[in-house]
Amino acid sequence: MNASCKRIVLGIANVMSWPWRLLPSGLREGILTGLFVLDSRGEPRDGLAQLLRLQDRLDWVTNERAVAMGDGVHPKHRLTRYHDFFVEHIPAGTRVLDIGCGVGAVARSIATRVKGSEVVGVDRDDGRLAEARAADNPENLSFVKTDVCDSLPDGPWQAVVLSNVLEHIEDRVGFLKTILQNAKPERVLIRVPHFERDWKMPMRKELGLNYFSDAEHFIEHRLDELNAELAEAGLRPMVTQTLWGEIWMCCECTESDGQ
């Protein structure tokens, strides 16, 4: 479902929800559960596949409500504390390039919490950059519109942040090599979704269903897959954590890259 369709669905739901919500919550839950059970009957394989497709829709609505509750910021930033990983692995006084910064949440945390840092967030989405620039930003944080496959802000940069970026890139090794050549970082901090986060991921793959958390993903890595790509690109993980269904890494450039 594209963004326009989602907006239409949500608009209709906002209008039609009030009579539905007049029913007691227990009754509403019972009706919905019954519908899920009815829809899953028949051949077990088909029923499981249908439930997993419905789960995708439910996840979309859950995330929409979470962002609304957070006044435009998903509470995962606060609850999973993944910002801390980036902050803790960036030394004071570092020049940081946050590639694919989105609305600037990670870049803002780094700029605010890493003493003496200079942070530039880059993205190619005008809407997200407008939201990032409109926030309460510290003086050591700025945002630039660019496609990093074509150009980067003037470096060198001591640290490059790739938070939920690599999975959106088809030629990830080529992309990383370009970043290392042009930005010349001392370290690269990476966050990607972990394929082995849940039994449902390989089950989805076995059933021929979508097993990505975003329709724009080309991959959701196993740890060995990510390590192989990083090695080919010229990066060596110094720190690796698997938390919250994600892989977090702080990498250094290998000597073979001349970094």
Placement of each model-derived feature along the sequence:
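Conserved class I S-adenosyl-L-methionine
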Residues: 189-211
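Conserved N-terminal segment of class I S-adenosyl-L-methionine
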Residues: 2-155, 176, 205, 216-219, ...
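A short glycine-rich, Lys/Arg-flanked "PGG" loop and its adjoining helix->strand segment in the class I
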Residues: 174-187
